[in-house]
């Protein structure tokens, strides 16, 4: 939880947690959003890749690593798909990321595969999907698809498509 997710994402997460009876531990930065902004400014507004790297390190990568370390996790799974970005198209089903195995069971799934899986398992769509978003992240760096941009191209103003969680960079 970066502290910057849209309200719809928090509501959606709670709905899934309740409907599926999930036990979830929310991981967050040790630095509150307000403190981070006071120290570094709104890193997503500068249009500098280095500032986005700092933002991702503080809000995403470090909290995930702390959580994985806390529970001594040696392998974790993610829902990345090869069709999402050029970088993800080069990924393997199992890889080592920051000294841990990263399992990508959905790597070759298509949008159609996702749709039918969700239908067959009565999983609700993210509410922003109905509003034209095909990729949802933080409120300040996600936007609905349009004629020229869609998917992860809408993220971070088109400057970056990856936050660093799924890469060794």
Question: What are the residue ranges of the model-derived segments?
Answer:
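Nucleotide-activated chemistry modules centered on ATP-dependent adenylation/adenylyltransferase
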Residues: 1-169
């Amino acid at each position: 939880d970066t502290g910057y997710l849209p309200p719809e994402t928090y509501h959606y997460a709670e709905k899934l947690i309740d409907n599926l009876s999930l036990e979830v531990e929310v991981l967050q930065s040790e630095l509150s959003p307000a403190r981070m902004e006071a120290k570094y400014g709104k890193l997503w507004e500068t249009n500098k890749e280095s500032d986005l790297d700092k933002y991702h390190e503080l809000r995403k990568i470090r909290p995930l690593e702390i959580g994985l370390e806390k529970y001594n996790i040696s392998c974790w799974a993610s829902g990345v798909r090869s069709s999402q970005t050029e970088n993800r198209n080069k990924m393997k089903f199992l890889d080592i990321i920051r000294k841990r195995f990263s399992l990508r069971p959905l790597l070759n799934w298509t949008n159609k595969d996702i749709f039918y899986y969700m239908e067959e398992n009565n999983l609700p769509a993210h509410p922003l999907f109905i509003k034209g978003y095909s990729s949802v992240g933080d409120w300040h760096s996600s936007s609905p698809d349009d004629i020229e941009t869609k998917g992860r191209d809408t993220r971070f103003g088109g400057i970056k498509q990856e936050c660093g969680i799924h890469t060794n960079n």
